[in-house]
């Protein structure tokens, strides 16, 4: 592994001249992360669901003067996922320095009634697509001895949750996958880490936000006194994408307002 650069601390966080590929970036946490990486100097390739006309993230990145490209792909379609990295490389001039796997879906149902189709969809999007993209990134980054891979995990990487067996299984496995890849690739100067969001005010948590009882129960347990917002991930993602985290390997950074400390 290369040593941390001997430059002034602010420069450690610069992503100038780098390119990032990010999934799940048309809204919520993913959009905030994509914009933050662009603010730090990176050019961005977004993975977007086919048929989506949401250009808000792309427009925000372009307004910063960065190059932004879009690859349309359904992350539940394994064959489509296998083609993403190659398309991104072509779009970004043959170099990807940073991969952020942020896309995720949720399906809720009691375990005894949980549909097999929902299980397959959640596992494919939340775990298999991450594995395939990380593998493709590793094939590109390891020979070049440079790269950062950031996998979005969850509180359910550590806890079991309720009525979300597929999501818990996928996120638990993702934490271990992050460590497994880090064990192999850290010596090749490719750092693999994760971020585990706490309770964040996004569309995925809309049902919880609309349930007065659960909203109160959750809110009372968060030491920070509030739910997280997408912008709370700007600093963590830039840190893990930059030279500032050069010696951080195989970690899952929990961004939860103190939830896991209770």
Region spans (language model):
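Conserved glycine-rich cofactor-binding loop
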Residues: 19, 26-27
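Short C-terminal tail/terminal secondary-structure segment
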Residues: 2-11, 159, 237-238, 249-262
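Conserved glycine-rich Rossmann-like NAD(P)H-binding loop of the short-chain dehydrogenase/reductase
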Residues: 40-56
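Alpha-helical segment proximal to the catalytic Tyr-Lys
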Residues: 139, 183-187, 246
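Residue(s) in the substrate-gating loop at a strand-loop-helix junction
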Residues: 154
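Active-site helix of classical SDR
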Residues: 134, 170, 178
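Substrate-binding pocket helix/loop in short-chain dehydrogenase/reductase
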Residues: 81, 110-111, 115-123, 149, ...
